[in-house]
Amino acid sequence: MKDVALQLKNVGKSYGNKVVLESIDFEVRHGSMVALLGTSGAGKSTLFRCLTGLEPIDSGSIVALGESIHELSPARLRAVRGQIGFVFQQLHLVKRFSALENVLGARLAEMPIWRVTLKSFSRADKVLAFECLDRVGMLDYANTPTQLLSGGQQQRIAIARALAQKPKIIIADEPVSSLDPLTARSVLQTLKAAATDLNVAVLCSLHQVDLAREFGDRIVGMRDGRVVFDGTPAEFTDERVHALYQVPAGKMHQRPRATRSTRWPVWLWHEGRSDDHIHTPHTRAAPGHRTALAPERALQRQTSAGADRRHGAVVRDRTTHRNGPHGGHDGTGRGQDRGPG
């Protein structure tokens, strides 16, 4: 039996006369991923604010790593939060910073991220950041300004930043709500790998039933501020889906998804392309050229390239970043494809 990392016991929360959370009970164990489902207004966002300690609770307790977070002193609460990685729908990445710099920001909890430079970090911190980028498949983009990355890639950077804290718990609030299906699965695979490979307890809120069934070790369903289902994906039958959402289960996947990728023709998805391919960064190397480096080698390259220049901004390879963010060459001798139209 895996140890319990996060446990909610009879949690209640009200705003005036309006009850938002009532008798919430469930737990998340180390090495497992719990998918939290619910309709809009079910209380998921309020619950996540309570989990961060930003909102007080009216009754019950939230126990993280053996400590009730709403009974801790501010100093002790900061220490417990340091062992919890948060991934929010609003990523709070510094867009002008590189992917590497955003991940390194997690290593300096007491310093505002806009004051961070590469000189602020030890060699061990830099190696850890490269390892986290490698784990989420973003090592090739360590030097890339975050504003040039697609939504799915930015989400992976946020996960890498959470992993850089060496967390025992990861709490992800709607991490794939604005992503296309292929990219959403890729991001959830990254979170699932953190649970299985690093023994991290992952709590992830979702809207998509199929994704919850595919990636969750357990599913918790909320409606009207209460937990109405807590069980395995196999137990989450179509009848239980109907009971949770109060609509016929067969209609669940027919809702149109309004994402920023819907302006692209449908054939992009039929060919298996994801959001990452639509918004290709301009630091991708020529076909067949391996740019991924082992963390130690990548760090050596950073150091030799003078990575501490310009307030810590990472110096990019001139051969792969020639003509700015909107066109020109990508290092292959060909122009960038901006998509149809």
UniProtKB/Swiss-Prot annotation:
Residues 307-320, 327-341 have a biased composition (Basic and acidic residues). Its EC number is 7.6.2.-. Its main location: membrane. It catalyses: phosphinate(out) + ATP + H2O = phosphinate(in) + ADP + phosphate + H(+). CDD domains: ABC_PhnC_transporter. It is a peripheral membrane protein. GO terms for molecular function: ABC-type phosphonate transporter activity; ATP binding; ATP hydrolysis activity. Residues 278-341 are annotated as: Disordered. Pfam families: ABC_tran (PF00005). Keywords: ATP-binding, Cell inner membrane, Cell membrane, Membrane, Nucleotide-binding, Translocase, Transport. It is found in: Cell inner membrane. Residues 6-249 form the ABC transporter domain. GO terms for cellular component: plasma membrane. ATP binds at G38, T39, S40, G41, A42, G43, K44, S45. Transmembrane segments: none annotated. Part of the ABC transporter complex HtxBCDE involved in hypophosphite import. Responsible for energy coupling to the transport system. PANTHER family: AMINO ACID IMPORT ATP-BINDING PROTEIN, PHOSPHONATES IMPORT ATP-BINDING PROTEIN PHNC. Belongs to the ABC transporter superfamily. Phosphonates importer (TC 3.A.1.9.1) family. NCBIfam families: ABC_phnC (TIGR02315). The complex is composed of two ATP-binding proteins (HtxD), two transmembrane proteins (HtxC and HtxE) and a solute-binding protein (HtxB). This is Hypophosphite import ATP-binding protein HtxD. It comes from Stutzerimonas stutzeri (Pseudomonas stutzeri).
